[in-house]
Amino acid sequence: MEYVKLNNGVKMPELGLGTFLLSPADAENAVYNALKSGYRLIDTGNAYHNERAVGRGIKKSGVKREDIFLESKLWPTVYTKSAAIDEMLERLDTPYVDLLLLHQPAGDYIEGYKMMEKAVKV
């Protein structure tokens, strides 16, 4: 597996599985099979409506969470919702994500960015 080193020193796999347009059942199976096949980067977003299934696929795979690079995205409608990140983590059934993005620069994305900055734990 090839990796790219991010500015904060974290290594991110160059190849991963995206879960856009996957039903919850398909997302769970795809994540499980991808991790069993050696993938270590999983991408999802709250707009995909499959975060719970992604979390189940990760748990089912038996791969240690610290060996997975998990990324998600916040949708503009939750940029100013103070509980948005905690709710995302609950849906994914994980204590952290490795990369969190603003899905698009719409709505109050400046507040969304500030909220994400406050949530960073090193």
Please describe what each predicted stretch is:
Residues 80-122:
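Glycine/proline-rich, positively charged
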Residues 14, 71-73, 98-102:
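Short beta-strands and strand-loop turn motifs
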Residues 37, 73-74, 78, 117:
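Solvent-exposed, non-transmembrane amphipathic alpha-helical segments
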Residues 25, 49, 79-80, 111:
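Residues that form or flank phosphate/diphosphate-binding pockets in enzymes
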Residues 20-22, 45-47, 73-77, 102-105:
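Active-site beta-loop-alpha junctions enriched in small/polar residues
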Residues 1-68, 95, 118-121:
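N-terminal binding-site loop/beta-alpha segment at the start of enzyme catalytic domains
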